[in-house]
Amino acid sequence: MTKHYLNSKYQSEQRSSAMKKITMGTASIILGSLVYIGADSQQVNAATEATNANNNQSAQVSQATSQPINFQVQKDGSSEKSHMDDYMQHPGKVIKQNNKYYFQAVLNNASFWKEYKFYNANNQELATTVVNDDKKADTRTINVAVEPGYKSLTTKVHIVVPQINYNHRYTTHLEFEKAIPTLADAAKPNNVKPVQPKPAQTKTPTEQTKPVQPKVEKVKPTVTTTSKVEDNHSTKVVSTDTTKDQTKTQTAHTVKTAQTAQEQNKVQTPVKDVASAKSESNNQAVSDNKSQQTNKVTKQNESPKQASKAKELPKTGLTSVDNFISTVAFATLALLGSLSLLLFKRKESK
């Protein structure tokens, strides 16, 4: 009787069951990978949409303009200063936002202010909103809707101080140092086009000033001529002396002219050297100016590229690629593990 592991039918059944296991394992791994990648891509898309929404909101927020304004809180029906003035920070602010005006004030000991209402000259209640409520510092920042031209506001408050059993309601009036001014709209940065400086025009070498060459005065040699012998009727001895004197004079004259020519050459040589040195320095200055201007132009061209790169959103797509690679690696390792386990079982069955 043949052993069961040598039976062809048993072997085919084992192969089919092994293929089923491999197929099920591979399918489960692929399905899990797809689910993981889909969830990760949804998170990435949600983060990208949130970033874009924040950028759009920040771009759509209108620029607010403000101006400080002094004020004083006075008792009702008089110009005497009220104690309420000591519980408000000075100065206040006039704010223009979305074409609406607000008077902004900061209340000290905010826990004492149980109620506060503001009215205009026509006894109409003005809308009041809380901008900031700092519990630790016990301060509260409020905005009161106003209009340009308001000079005073009527206030009705309810103050409670538990430490001294103070609980009162009273009316005061808030007097501005000047009427609420009209503020200009804030400049929108998106509509302002940056002015690019024009590069300075360089002069061509032909337009540049030529170096001034110093004028050299030519030195004319002074020749002293000896007086001719007037007396032609002198004796022979005298005539010999006269000829000697003439020859000496001529030789002295030739020596002086040669020395004068040498001095002229010496004077002209340094003048030429100075002129050539000045021309070389001018050429170097022109080349330096050109190189500096080219560097400025390249920097100006690179600055808008850097600004455009700063405005780009972060590249969140790279994280999904990394996750996909890690998932594929994990699936490959799982598949190899299942195959090795299958081979190990087959060896044990044999």
Curated annotation (Swiss-Prot):
Record-annotated NEAT domain positions: 62-184
Biased composition (Polar residues): 252-268, 278-306
Propiece residue ranges: 317-350
Paired cysteines (S-S): none
Annotated motif LPXTG sorting signal, positions: 313-317
InterPro entries named in the record: IsdA, LPXTG_anchor, NEAT_dom, NEAT_dom_sf
Pfam families: Gram_pos_anchor, NEAT
Entry membrane topology: Peptidoglycan-anchor
Region of interest called Disordered, as start-end residue ranges on this chain: 187-314
Binding-site positions, heme: 75, 82, 166
Induction of the gene: Repressed by fur in the presence of iron.
Comp. bias intervals (Low complexity): 188-199
Keywords, alphabetical: Cell wall, Heme, Iron, Metal-binding, Peptidoglycan-anchor, Secreted, Signal
Recorded GO CC terms: extracellular region
Cleaved signal peptide residues: 1-46
Matching SMART domains: NEAT
Protein task: Cell wall-anchored surface receptor that participates in the extraction of heme from oxidized methemoglobin/metHb to enable growth on hemoglobin as a sole iron source. Receives heme from IsdB and transfers it to IsdC. Also plays a role in the inhibition of host immune response. Protects S.aureus against the bactericidal protease activity of apolactoferrin. Decreases bacterial cellular hydrophobicity, which renders S.aureus resistant to bactericidal human skin fatty acids as well as to beta-defensins and cathelicidin.
Family: Belongs to the IsdA family.
Free-text comment about domains: The NEAT domain is responsible for binding Fe(3+) and Fe(2+) heme and fibrinogen. The NEAT domain is an inhibitor of apolactoferrin activity, while the C-domain confers resistance to bovine lactoferricin.
Name by which UniProt lists this protein: Iron-regulated surface determinant protein A
Gene source species: Staphylococcus aureus (strain bovine RF122 / ET3-1)
Lineage of origin: Bacteria, Bacillati, Bacillota, Bacilli, Bacillales
Encoding gene, per UniProt annotation: isdA
